[in-house]
């Protein structure tokens, strides 16, 4: 037994083993470690690049929303100060004039009201309060169904959405969303010497032109069922009220809801979400930001995002190619290293065998190595002589 362990110990300490370890450890251990570290760093950089991409796209969407809000306010304020509205009032065609201007400005409603006819319910809006004190103001606010009915029955009908059960959303017993998200503006206007308020607005529920324009600005192409990679959505709280995310074919995911994780971060905590997120039925690299009303309350979210799958496949293929290249290096260079190592330990093993023969009494034993074999061959020659 002792002879066995002694032999094993000597074998472990043999030159052959040491040389093999020296030759193969860098290839079999160090290189894989370096490769894993490199892949991990590359993977993080790649993910950061995707996040930076969606962040810039979210900024474009936010700027467009702000531009619409600003343009709506500027247009209504300019109209209130124009001579055209005064002339229309003098000619008794104010209603026709407002209807034409509403269509020209792309508004969903435009009307003039007297301060005394504005009930307490309408006066709750800071936008209206500001106009009553002589200053125009524009904001995004939530209108209850009754508010919309007072303006136009068609707006109440446009706003209503049946809620669709959505995977990963916060559980809710609510079956429909009847409120409307409105960009509304109010400006003071003088009609025949009487101070009044010019009010106008754009309903964002089912406003597909608005959301498709955002998608075109961000992704430079129109989203279709066949190419749904770039998406944009407007949320009223956590409900999709305008979106080009598809449920299937050309059916938009109106009435579906955001995931509980995103709702908590954006609506509850006021954070901007820049990460992967589950959107209706797939994973997207997503950007969400909160939308605030005139009371500085979070009332919804603006979202842009693109499918993760194409980028995940590119990343998977790239990592696979790195490992294939590494394995190819091993296949090519391990035989080379073994051959180089063999050029060292083979002469040494031959010398060891020769010395053992001499120890057993065979004085004719010789190494007979070629002297051109380097330093080891020189040592072998001296031993032979």
Predicted feature residues:
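Short, hydrophobic beta-strand elements of compact beta-sandwich sensory domains
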Residues: 185, 194-204, 278, 285-312
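Membrane-interface helix-start motif
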Residues: 306-325
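Cytoplasmic juxtamembrane amphipathic helix immediately C-terminal to a transmembrane segment
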Residues: 18, 22, 39, 43, ...
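HAMP signal relay modules and closely related sensory coiled-coil linkers
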Residues: 343-385
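Short hydrophobic alpha-helical segments used for membrane anchoring or interfacial signaling
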Residues: 110-116, 224-227, 231-239
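Membrane-proximal amphipathic alpha-helices
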Residues: 31, 35-92, 104, 280
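Extracytoplasmic/periplasmic sensor domains and loops in membrane signaling proteins
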Residues: 93-100, 104-175, 207-221, 242-277
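Extreme N-terminal signal-anchor transmembrane helix of membrane signaling/transducer proteins, especially
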Residues: 3-4, 13-44, 323-327, 331
């Amino acid at each position: 037994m002792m002879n066995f362990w002694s032999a094993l110990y000597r074998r472990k300490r043999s030159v052959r083993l040491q040389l093999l370890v020296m030759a193969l450890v860098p290839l079999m251990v160090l290189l894989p470690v370096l490769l894993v570290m490199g892949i991990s760093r590359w993977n993080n950089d790649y993910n950061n690049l995707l996040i930076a991409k969606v962040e810039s796209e979210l900024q474009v969407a936010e700027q467009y929303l702000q531009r619409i809000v600003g343009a709506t306010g500027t247009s209504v304020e300019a109209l209130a100060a124009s001579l055209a509205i005064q002339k229309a009032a003098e000619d008794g065609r104010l209603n026709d004039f407002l209807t034409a201007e509403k269509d020209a400005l792309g508004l969903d409603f435009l009307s003039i009201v007297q301060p005394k006819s504005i009930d307490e319910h309408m006066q709750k809006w800071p936008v209206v309060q500001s106009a009553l004190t002589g200053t125009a103001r524009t904001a995004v606010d939530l209108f209850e169904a009754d508010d919309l009915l007072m303006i136009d029955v068609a707006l109440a009908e446009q706003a209503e959405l049946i809620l669709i059960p959505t995977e990963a959303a916060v559980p809710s017993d609510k079956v429909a969303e009847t409120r409307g998200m409105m960009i509304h503006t109010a400006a003071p206007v003088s009609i025949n010497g009487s101070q009044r308020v010019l009010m106008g607005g754009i309903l964002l529920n089912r406003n597909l032109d608005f959301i498709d324009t955002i998608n075109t600005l961000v992704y430079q192409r129109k989203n279709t069922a066949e190419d749904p990679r770039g998406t944009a959505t407007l949320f009223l709280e956590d409900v999709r009220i305008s979106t080009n995310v598809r449920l299937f074919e050309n059916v938009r995911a109106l009435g579906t809801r955001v995931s509980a994780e995103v709702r908590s971060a954006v609506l509850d905590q006021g954070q901007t979400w820049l990460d992967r997120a589950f959107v209706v039925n797939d994973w997207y690299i997503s950007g969400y930001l909160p939308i605030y009303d005139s009371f500085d309350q979070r009332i919804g979210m603006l979202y842009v995002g693109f499918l993760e799958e194409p980028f995940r496949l590119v990343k998977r293929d790239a990592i696979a190619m790195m490992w294939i290249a590494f394995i190819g290096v091993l296949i090519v260079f391990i035989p080379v290293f073994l051959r180089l190592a063999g050029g060292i330990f083979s002469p040494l093993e031959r010398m060891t065998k020769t010395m053992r023969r001499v120890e057993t009494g065979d004085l004719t034993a010789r190494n007979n190595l070629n002297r051109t074999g380097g330093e080891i061959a020189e040592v072998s020659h001296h031993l032979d002589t």
